Each structure stands twice: as C-alpha cells, then as structure tokens.
C-alpha cells in the first residue's frame, strides 16, 4: 500500500479510537474503517512494522485483542503534510490539514530556495490561480509575466531598460515604410519536442490580426528560408516592439488541437508548464531552450487565496529567515488605479456627474479613509504615471436627482474591494447608493455590460512611450467607454507623431479617466537570491535569477 494511503488510514483509526489503548476485535476495527477483516489485519501488521502501534492479538471466541498507539495521529498528520509539501501536492495538503491558517504557515515555512536531487527550486506564494495563459486573450498582470517565461516572440523587450533585443528573429530591417523583414533562427524547438517552422510563426501572427494594434498587418509571407516579410497598410515605427509583446508570442500552429492549451500552453521559451491547478503552477527550465538555459530549474507558484486578505498580497518568496537573510524589493508602479466613466450611460456621460464624483472620490479622500497598512502602500495619483500631474480636481456640486451609481470591477483583487468599500461609504455620506458589480476578468476586459463607472488598474512596461498607448488601446473596455477616433490615434502613434503626455491629459481633462492611486509593488525575498530585479509588473525574470551557494 502506498505510504500516503497508509498514513491516512492510521490517522482515521487514531481519530476513531481517540488515540487511546483499548481492547477490541478485528471485526470492530474493520467496521470503523469500512474494510474487510482480512484487510484490517494487513493494515495492523503494516502499521506495527512501521512502529506506529502494537497489536496484541488474542485467539479464540469472545477474546479481545489489545490495540496500543505508539504514535499520535497529529504527529503522523504533520509528517504526511511535510511529505505533501515536498511533493508539491498542495490540493491534498489543504484537504489533510483543513485549517487554512495552518496551511498558510506551513507553506510560508517552505518558501524560497530549495535544493533537491541536484536541482534548484524556487517556491513562491501567490493569492490566486492563473488558469489562462493564452497569448492574445485577456491576460492580467501576472499572467502576462508568466506567458513571457513560457513563450518566445520575434523580438524581446528588455525589462530593465526597455531596449529591443533579438529573440526568435536574430536580425530585422525596414525594407520600406510598409514592409519589414525579419531573419529567424533555425533549430528552435517547442516544449513538446517539435521543431519550430515558418508556418508556426505565420499562423501565430495571422491569428492576432483582429486585435486593434495588429489590424494594419495586411500580409505575412516567407520569400526565402527563415526569412519573414510583414506587409502593413500604414507605417509603424513601433512594429519591432509590437512583435515582442505577449499577443505576438509564437504558438505551435496545432495549438487548438492540444488539450487544455490555455492552462497548459506549449511555447519555445525558457520554461515549460508541468502543472497548472487551482492550487499550484509549476514550470520547469526547458533544457532545449535556444537561449541561455535558466539557472533556476523549477519554479513553483503555490496558490493560497486567503493571503489576498492582506494588503501586501503580491509576491512572497520569503522562506525561513536565517541570519538577516530577508530582503524586500519594492518600486512604485508605472501606472495606477483609476476610475473610468462609461459614456454609454447617461450618468457616466454627464459632465457634472463626472466632476462631482471625481471630487468626492479624490485620491486624498480615498487615502484618508484607508487602513494604515494600505496607506503605506498607496500614493495619491494625479496622472497615469507617477511623474505626471495632469488631474485638476474641482469642487463640483452634486447633480440634482443623483441617487445611485453602478461601479464594476473584476474578481480576485482585494484592493478593488477595499477601494469600492471606501467609495461606497464616501458616496453614502451624500445620499448616493453605490451598486457594486464584481465580474470575471474576461467580462471586464470586453466591457459589454452596463456600468456608470469602472474601477481599473494599469501597469505600463518599458519603454513607456510604447506601452502607455499600446496598453490603453488594446483593452476593448476603454474603446467602448471613451468615444474618440482610436484608429486615428493609433495611426499617429505608429507614425511617431503622438505627444503621449498631451494625449493622456485630454483623457483626464474631461474626466473620462480619473487617476486614484499609485501602488508600491513589493517582493519579499531572500538575500541569497541573485539577479532578482523587479520589473514593472511586480515580478522578476526567472531565467536570470540564481541562488548564491552558502558560505563554505
């Protein structure tokens, strides 16, 4: 019998007997465990051989045998829990222990670095699962980061300085204003073993042609081996950066036929997905990666939803602290939480409503009414970027007849709930009821349901001149809520003729967007980890991090 099953049987027997020595029979014990008399004898003999109990059998009708426990069920449960932790069986651990606070403490004690069978393993604690990792779909901040570890694209944007680097394409050039040529590396392999072919690249880039930022791609072909031509309907100085973004990651052309591809995707990146469940995401270093092999062999993201109730619920790498090993990496996000007024509803489009609501729900009001732990993580926002001060809050008078407003945000985000509660209380002081809708991220991203205002957040990556417009333009919700010629804006941006600061100031001037809070991103880690540089998404590049060996 497998060790885990035997441990479960012992714990159950110990609980049924209250851990006390007693005189009993095989039949009585078999009834307790719902098994046959013969199987019960086998269980007792095996448990006795393990040193967990003694079974003094008496032969004869009416005679009772003595059962003595040498090991407590609690001790064995703890041992079983440790075994499950080492095996990364978090779902079974939660079932075994039951108490989520106890599970949390056990997980934290095993965070950080682990060295098993010659492999470096990093364990991370996160507050929600990541079910969808499919490029070109609605991905949140963390899914975007993980996708970058799994997939490759024609180009790559350096997370630290925003500079463009080679990836699948080793060189590229602009042949004419409407034609770019990329030269691809041969011999690249997908995680499932097949070699990447030009058809995979063409299929991957063709499938995203419906997205706004890629809609100007008119034709993709290969004039010669490992050479890719991309034809455009309008010039685009940002095209090489655009092809380094997650939607343009390269998938095997048969991806739609592969089981559970969104949660278990296959790419050509430095890490391959081994497991993705509600309790754990495990990715392994890909030995056949065409770039430098990752130095951390395995990354385990353990999911414990209850940690989202804490204000600093981002990324935890902190294991047992030894000799002042704890380190905290932090940065103020390049982006903010903001309110988005929906021009499709009468209240959302009303200038006086926008003016008054933005006054009542000002950054300083939100910060003042927040709990102290959140006040340490929040910074008032007066522009989409921390360095900008575009917002001009006015006094505003409450519009006559305003009695209710609808606010919508996406699930699994504790700070959205906190901000919404503060907003509800502030508006209630003025006899306005805030109706709150909490929806799935896909629904929020599409923005097709009715709401007066939406609670959003944006994290812009480097280079900001590229990502600020690209991020806002690629979210259908914003295009639905803000009536303007987005295609004309995109043409100006592609041509390098857009003044982004002025463009953002226009959005803030009519209160279409109202910045609320900049957030401090935090990674709680260990000083033994090298190469950990937090990116603008609040994560770090796994393949570039490594562990310093202990002092001899």
Swiss-Prot record:
Classification via InterPro entries: SBP_5, SBP_5_dom, SgrR_HTH_N, Tscrpt_reg_SgrR, WH_DNA-bd_sf
Residue span of region Solute-binding: 163-493
GO molecular function, one term: peptide transmembrane transporter activity
UniProt KW Metal-binding keyword: no
Gene3D superfamilies: Periplasmic binding protein-like II (3.40.190.10)
Record-linked Pfam families: SBP_bac_5, SgrR_N
Highest taxon of source: Bacteria
GO biological process: negative regulation of DNA-templated transcription; peptide transport; positive regulation of DNA-templated transcription
DNA-binding region in chain numbering: 26-49
Domain HTH marR-type: 1-116
Keywords from the UniProt entry: Activator, DNA-binding, Repressor, Transcription, Transcription regulation
Function: Activates the small RNA gene sgrS under glucose-phosphate stress conditions as well as yfdZ. Represses its own transcription under both stress and non-stress conditions. Might act as a sensor of the intracellular accumulation of phosphoglucose by binding these molecules in its C-terminal solute-binding domain.
Protein name per its UniProtKB record: HTH-type transcriptional regulator SgrR
Name of encoding gene: sgrR
